[in-house]
UniProtKB/Swiss-Prot annotation:
GO terms for molecular function: structural constituent of ribosome. It comes from Alkalilimnicola ehrlichii (strain ATCC BAA-1101 / DSM 17681 / MLHE-1). InterPro entries: Ribosomal_bL34, Ribosomal_bL34_CS. The gene is rpmH. This is Large ribosomal subunit protein bL34. Gene3D superfamilies: 1.10.287.3980. One of its GO terms (biological process) is translation. Keywords: Ribonucleoprotein, Ribosomal protein. GO terms for cellular component: ribonucleoprotein complex; ribosome. The keyword Ribonucleoprotein applies. The keyword Hydrolase does not apply. Disulfide bonds: none annotated. Belongs to the bacterial ribosomal protein bL34 family.
Amino acid sequence: MKRTYQPSVTKRKRTHGFRARMATKNGRAVLARRRAKGRHRLCP
């Protein structure tokens, strides 16, 4: 059986990257929350 997680840098960046987050209002909210919490890494 194939595992569910098949890593790909491209897909990761496109779905969870900084520019993907900045593209939507909700994505910007995510970044704001993570900044407020004091995360060193805002996006993977």
